[in-house]
Amino acid sequence: TQMESPGATGTLSWILSALSISAKIIANKVRCARLVDVLGEAGADNVQGEAQQKLDVISNQVLLRLLGGREGVAIVASEENEEPVIIRDDPTGERRYCVLFDPLDGSSNLDVCGGVGTIFSILRHDRRAARAHDSLLQPGTQQVAAGYVLYG
């Protein structure tokens, strides 16, 4: 509770709620994928050189849109994007967190009804870093939160 953590502002909970809402939207897209013709390749490769799936692109857009609108998020980094997205300048220091994610891990399993999910990690944004991107290069022990949402 907030009484147990006097420095808590609710910002982390607000970010987790964006991830939760994103997961509900993505789960619905995965569930209805065959019906609305969003299975298969999107026609581009991701940064690892893998063929991007249509649902990879859709899931990435959902997460970027919802996380980008949350106060407290400074940087968002996705497996589907070559560069991290800096949400906004933050002269007041209110944007305290970086969110890293794979929007649809295992998307190549969709054609065979294999399991897919979203992997995420939340780190504190280091405003003292020489480059904003350096905030993303932290050991796992520095994670504030991390998780995997399994869709099926």
Residue ranges and their predicted role:
Residues 1-104:
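N-terminal subdomain of lithium-sensitive/metallo-dependent phosphomonoesterases centered on the IMPase/IPPase/PAP
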Residues 94-151:
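DPxDG-like acidic metal-binding loop motif
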